[in-house]
């Protein structure tokens, strides 16, 4: 899995888990396909604090985040996943002798860093006056919308989606994230995910120019994280400190090989630490 794909899934799971059930890489039955993220909200959840993202997840949704703008073939593949899920729900309702409520059926949200006018027009997608700029809805039959992240207004309401953008869009969002109060739980958790993404990109030597701009914004936080890791190692013993950090890095999506390289450990040391984790 590409570093950004892992980051996007972990990031959305971090934000949405308090609100309902999150399934990452959910398989659909017609063939070997996986939905990036399938979310079912808890009835009592109140996602208002997530702004536009919270509005999206008021009901059951499929979310497909893209690092690069999807082409028409990729969008058709997303639609196929949605149609498969809808067909499964219809069959389930029939088996259980229940009515199938189309209004409560899942929706598909495609998150793209940008969307060309040609693509939008080819999809028959339109802006909705009740939604911000950059949110394009396909004809209602398809229960699908595509969000051009770079077109979203720069407001607090869109912050959590703009963090999944690219280049200047993402860099601006990271700056806003850093300005949040340090006691903000999401601030700390998301920064940790961003730092993990940076480590993974550096290890794989796949930093792009626009990524470097974002990582420059994160540089001070990254240095603070490294210093904290060193202090932790000194306080608990150098090796013990490294071993303590393995479960956290694993949870953030780094592979065994990446963790070993980042912490300067043998692969066997990392594997053993993972096995001993409760």
Q: What are these regions, as identified by a protein language model?
A:
Residues 63, 147, 164-278:
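Short, charged alpha-helical interaction segments and adjacent helix-coil junctions
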């Amino acid at each position: 899995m590409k570093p950004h794909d892992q980051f996007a899934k972990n990031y959305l799971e971090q934000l949405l888990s308090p609100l309902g059930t999150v399934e990452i890489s959910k398989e659909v039955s017609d063939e070997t396909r996986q939905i990036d993220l399938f979310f079912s909200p808890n009835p009592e959840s109140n996602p208002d604090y997530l702004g536009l993202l919270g509005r999206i997840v008021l009901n059951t949704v499929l979310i497909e985040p893209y690092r690069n703008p999807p082409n028409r073939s990729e969008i058709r593949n997303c639609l196929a996943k949605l149609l498969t899920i809808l067909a499964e729900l219809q069959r389930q309702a029939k088996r259980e002798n229940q009515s199938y409520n189309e209004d409560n059926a899942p929706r598909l949200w495609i998150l793209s860093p940008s969307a060309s006018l040609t693509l939008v027009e080819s999809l028959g997608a339109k802006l909705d006056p009740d939604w911000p700029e950059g949110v394009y809805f396909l004809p209602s039959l398809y229960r699908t919308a595509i969000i051009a992240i770079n077109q979203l207004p720069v407001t607090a309401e869109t912050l959590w989606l703009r963090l999944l953008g690219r280049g200047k869009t993402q860099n601006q969002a990271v700056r806003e994230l850093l300005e949040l109060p340090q006691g903000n739980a999401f601030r700390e958790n998301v920064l940790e995910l961003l730092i993990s993404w940076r480590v993974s990109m550096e290890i794989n030597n796949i930093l792009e120019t626009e990524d470097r701009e974002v990582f420059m914004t994160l540089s001070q936080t990254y240095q603070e994280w490294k210093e904290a890791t060193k202090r932790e190692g000194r306080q608990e013993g150098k090796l013990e400190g490294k071993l303590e950090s393995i479960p956290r890095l694993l949870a953030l999506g780094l592979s065994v090989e990446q963790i070993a390289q980042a912490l300067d450990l043998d692969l066997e040391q990392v594997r053993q630490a993972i096995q001993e984790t409760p």
